């Protein structure tokens, strides 16, 4: 609203300059016209500019999984602002630029790249569309017209690993990881390190999957492998649902608040929530104060959230999480500090050293204790055709 009043004041000042200062003072001549009888007729017009429009580009369908929850965050943040938002979903990396063009033609001066899979393309495409301001979710480095917004879900994964191990009888934990999710490798490693705080020699079996059919096969394989607790870090909601069907204890990376009470095997869940960040972006856009900066979502600022433990968890699980949360928030959990070895036993980091955020984000290796069971992702032979339908 403040920006609207500023625009009205600016318009009034411009009118004063056009008519002369005297014409804006009380008692002087206004912009009145006379009708055929000579009676003065005052014409008063108020010009209001349209609110800014922000377009979102989603990699997956907004009807399910993490993308559905991210879309809900878009809508909830917009409810508290004057910003209009719209989106295109199911956009592949190759169609990303086409979606940018479509949203630009729709009047979007701001575009949210709402998946880390676009990060490798965003820099070059943003440089071709300097009239557009971009917000890259899952991006760590900003540039002239790109606001970088990333998060550290591995903080929550550390807690998930501890919870999984404490509730395991076999000391064998499974994790289904979607490589397209933010920092999938650090998430697996953090979960393994958390697990090892409970059982030093425990094993974390990792299976990679994305689509519903793939994650279902991954869960089945982990159960066959002897894993009695499974951590789900996937876009798909099918991972958690399959665990529930099999009666296997699990931890979800999706917000289960709406139906947690009906999930008999759920231990806890953790989520990455950009709602408050998006609201702050909307406000800056409305006030014309937006600049391309950087944001990192953590447990401390409420972007990364860890739920209370659920009834399926053992007694004492909540005590572990409650003791860990303050340390995660103040940075004293030291997840990736001290000696770290990879799966071959090679020392990657020495004692009294700590990985930087940049080192963590770019991890391509797994810590000792992680075994890769299989990659259940199938090659994509035919990319779906996107018609760039814009929805509100």
Protein language model features and the residues they cover:
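An alpha-beta-alpha
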Residues: 74, 159-202, 206, 294-314
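Extracytoplasmic "Venus flytrap"
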Residues: 53-80, 86-93, 116, 180-185
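Periplasmic-binding protein-like
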Residues: 56-57, 108-116, 135-137, 225-236, ...
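Hydrophobic alpha-helical segments within soluble ligand-binding/sensing domains
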Residues: 149-172, 270-290
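Bacterial signal peptide processing site
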Residues: 25-28
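Flexible loop/hinge segments that line or gate small-molecule binding clefts
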Residues: 127-150, 256-265
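Segments of small-molecule ligand-sensing domains
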Residues: 290-392
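C-terminal motif of bacterial Sec signal peptides marking the signal peptidase cleavage site
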Residues: 20-23
